[in-house]
Structures are given as structure tokens and as C-alpha cells.
């Protein structure tokens, strides 16, 4: 969704459906979760606008109508985080621009056309003026990053009594460029350690028909996709430079059918569906029956307050393009043996609610993963890589890894309209591959948030986040100290023979926000103060080993020379205040 700052303006969202299981059959490529959000329609009666000026960004949005049959909404946002980050003394300076729009027009009483688009531009440069050991380490490996992404699509919908047909054509694009020089000295190309440009594009055409038959709803549809992935990389690997080019084209297809049922008294509901997908990457993936994806869910109200629910499903997802498009030195796609990744999910839940004001729920879940890509070089799952800047998947892989995740999630929601709302969730879980903790095995996640509306249009809100420490792999000091190895990537190498044998401490963060609104004739002015991590909590990472730049054995052959290393304490977290002004008119 755009990294730590979402690319989508939340003010424009009408509704969000978040699935962690029981995925709808009309959504492909889901293994972990599905975030399905729908934008509001523009205002058919009047034009409204909103401008926001904050400590880190400025934005402008609006919605209204172009004619009696056509409505619009839009949003554009520009950050100046680089100024804030420089003032805080951080070694990297991010900047982003994002925007979105939606046009909807009624062609007739039974036909409508919707066009929407999203765009995001990210640029991150380095603050080489920042001094200190922590900044020195981050600057030693972090590249400059330029990234552009956009999605544009059009949807035609025809209403025919009990039937609704939808035709959708969309295209998404991602252009990523990373550049890194040794010691950040770009005065000579001899200092270049990384120049990467990768482009991912996907064009999708889909048809869907929905039929309502009393208590039943039927859905069926099909889609075709064309994907293109290119990568042009020049990278230093130990003593030599590697030039890597790849160009991957994939044609894929899929179909689905699902049915939903709700009893006349609304106490029982059920959903069942099946989906299959295929593509022309290899023979295994062409065979649709090998990716048959059934799913089933039900819910039953035991009483007016108690409800029981459950779901089960087998889901598939294509491995990342970096893995599918990886070539060897002879230009041959070396990962042609990969398969669709799969997960078998089951869940059982119970919830209690008092009207719409108070709800308590608990759900147990089990996810069993199979056919996951395994790194031949490091003997760890590909899914456990990529929690830092860099490219993941450009290596030899085999589809043999298995894993599982299981746990229980509880939630409490309490709200009194116009006065306050309170939401909390606690998830206790384990995530493992071959009975070894995965990179995501934090054991627990607690989130508590609330907003209170005070008199005279004041409101105050807070959010507490508490997460268990993740496992980590110690560094390989012997390999990292080699001059050629260190100069190649400017950071230490992991000792994967000790994969995830250590664990970080837990971390908690508390955020506070205060809002005040003033209403005038045809205008609303709002002020806010937002303080993230008000307690100044520190997120601790494993101590990092770093080159001092001093060679211990300068007379040894170049391949045996070693840097004298030092350890740096790694922790992050600062109080981040922000103040802003919002105007609606």
C-alpha cells in the first residue's frame, strides 16, 4: 500500500474488507491476507474540497460532479519528510508524491462506467553530512532509491435484473532503481557496487457475473493476465563485477465460481467456491487441475449474542518475478522447476456481541504451507528473506520447503456513537519452517486504540502497539571481515548455519493525537497534534559488526586480507511530533 505511509488517502475509502482466511474465490494470488477496499463515489449534489498542511506533508482532495451523470473524486499529496528526517539527524531522507482519482458515469439506467487510478513516486537520498557510527554503518550499505508505481483501470457494469455483469481492464506498473557507490563516492564508476533497475508490469482483463436468487448469490468469472518483468543490474560480487539482464513474459489465466447463502432468519450463512489458475511459465503451472483451490466458510448464530464461525481453504500464489525470471550465466531460466506456492488454512471462531456497541471474539487458526521456494545457497526459505533493503529471489531455488503457522486471535470492540470507540486485539501465534522459527515468529502482537470525543469539538486518541521479539540469525564475522566481501556490499553477512537461533527483545510504542475542530459558514477548520512514540521507546536489533577501514594484514594476498572489525549497538526509535491544519470547504 505504499510502505509506512499508505499510497491511498483514507478519506476517499468507502469500505474495507480485510481477509486473513476464507478468501473470496474472485481474488487470486492470496496466501496471507487480502485487503479489498472500495472508494467512495463523488458527491452528485455539490463540490467539496479539503486541504491539509502538516509537519511532514501537504495534501489536497476534492469530490463532486462534472454533470448530472458523472461524479469524480481525487487526492494529491506531497511530503517533505526529508526536512523532518534531516532535523532529526537521520542518515536517509525519504520523499514521496502520491495521488488517486475516480470517475464514475451512468451511461444509461442499466449501464455505468468507472475509471480510477493510483500513482506513487518515492525518492530516497542519503544524508551523507550526518556523522556518528550508526549513520556511518547505514550509509555504508543503503542505496539511493527511486521508485514509481501506478495502477489505472476501467470497469464497465451492466445491471440486468437479477444479474450484474462486470468487465474490467487494468494495468499496473512498478519501476524500481537502486544505486550504490563504495563510501558513497560517485566521482568514479570504479566505486560502483550496485546499479539496479527492475520493471514489473501486469495487464489484466476479467469478466464477472453475479446473480441473486432469493437467499442465494452466485458468482462466476474468468480473467487473463499478461505480465512482464525486466531487470538490469550491475553489482560487485567480492572481487569482480557482475552484469545481469533478464526479461520475463508470462501469460496467465484463471476462473472461479462461488455461491453464498443466507437463511431467511439471518442466523445461518455459508459460502463455498472454487478457483483455478495457470500460466505458460512451465508445464506444471499450465495444468489447471494442479492449482484447484476450493474454499468453504460458514457462520451460525447460536443465540442473539453468540455466533460460531469456521472456514477452510486451499490457496495458491505465484512465486515472485525475481525468482521466476532469474537466469544463469548462459542466459537460461534456472528456476523453471518452481511451482505455485500453496497454503491449507483452517479456522474456528466464536464471538459475543451486545447490539452494535460491544463485541468480543476469539478465533483459532492453522496454516500449513507447501511447495515454498527454498534457497539452495543458504538452505533457508525465500519467504524468510527480504526484511531489509535489497533484492530477494534472484538465486537458485527449489520448491520443497514446508512450514506452518498457528495460533489464536482475540478482539474487543466497544463503541458509543458520538462519544468514544475502543478497539483491541491480541494474537498469540507460532510461525515455523521445519520446526525452526521463521523470520515472522514474533509469538504475540497486541494493539490497543481508542478515541474519545470531548466537549467543544475536542477529541483525543491513542494507540498502543506491543510486539514480541523476532528471531534473528547471527552474523558471520569471519566472512564479513574479508576486504573483498565487505567492499562488495558494505555490510556483514549472515551465518545461516545458525539460522534464527537468537531472539530480539519485545517492543512497545504509544502514539497520541489531539484534534480540535471549528465550524464556520460553509467551512470547517481543524487543528491536530500527533505524537508518535511519545515514550521514546527503542526498538533493539542485534549488534552489528562493521569494518573500521583498517586492514589487519595488508601484506597478505588480496583475497585473504581482512578488516579490523568493530561492534555497533543497534537500536532505533524517537519521539516524532507533528502538527497540522485541515480545511474543508
Residue ranges and their predicted role:
Residues 15-26, 32-40, 47-91, 98-106, ...:
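Predominantly transmembrane beta-strands of Gram-negative outer membrane beta-barrel pores used
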